[in-house]
């Protein structure tokens, strides 16, 4: 397993593990999706292989970031898959960062840029107030826009971000810079 840490962006990536080849084979690439020029990495093949998925979740759940956080925050939508499994394995509460129009109640919102456009994420204030330190979980790190959006939302509200855990990093997009 390779752990990469960037203090500047508070990002850790659990990217590879002992069954690297098997994991890579399960991540499919779709050219020109969701728009021309984008190579979309589909990580959903991982959850179709229970033993690989289980090993990945065990590895991610045993990180110091997860051990030391009060809660896990998962990013809409594929981050929910990995975040909820890690949350269950580590016995940590999970909070969700959702796209516009998906959460009820009093929200805090942050806009961000991604590889193929603009978007925003929201958190429920009432849930956020329960925890002080977070591990952020998503499926993939591309430009870093989504991860930085969540990090900024948390930090701007007095919360500590211990790190980010992802399954895949698209290094050519320099999301950690």
Question: What are the functions of these language-model segments?
Answer:
Residues 1-177:
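PRPP-associated nucleotide enzymes
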């Amino acid at each position: 397993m390779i752990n990469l840490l960037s203090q500047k962006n508070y990002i850790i990536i659990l990217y590879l593990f002992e069954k690297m080849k098997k994991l890579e084979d399960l991540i499919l690439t779709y050219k020109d999706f969701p728009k021309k020029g984008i190579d979309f990495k589909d990580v959903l093949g991982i959850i179709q292989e229970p033993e690989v998925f289980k090993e990945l979740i065990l590895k991610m759940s045993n990180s110091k970031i997860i051990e030391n956080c009060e809660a896990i925050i998962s990013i809409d939508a594929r981050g929910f898959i990995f975040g909820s499994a890690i949350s269950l394995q580590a016995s940590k509460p999970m909070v969700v960062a959702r796209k516009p129009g998906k959460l009820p109640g009093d929200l805090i919102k942050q806009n961000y840029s991604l590889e193929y456009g603009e978007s925003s994420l929201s958190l429920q204030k009432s849930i956020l107030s329960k925890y002080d330190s977070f591990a952020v979980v998503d499926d993939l790190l591309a430009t870093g826009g989504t991860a930085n959006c969540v990090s900024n939302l948390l930090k701007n509200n007095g919360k500590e971000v211990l790190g980010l855990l992802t399954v895949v990093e698209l290094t050519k997009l320099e999301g950690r810079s």
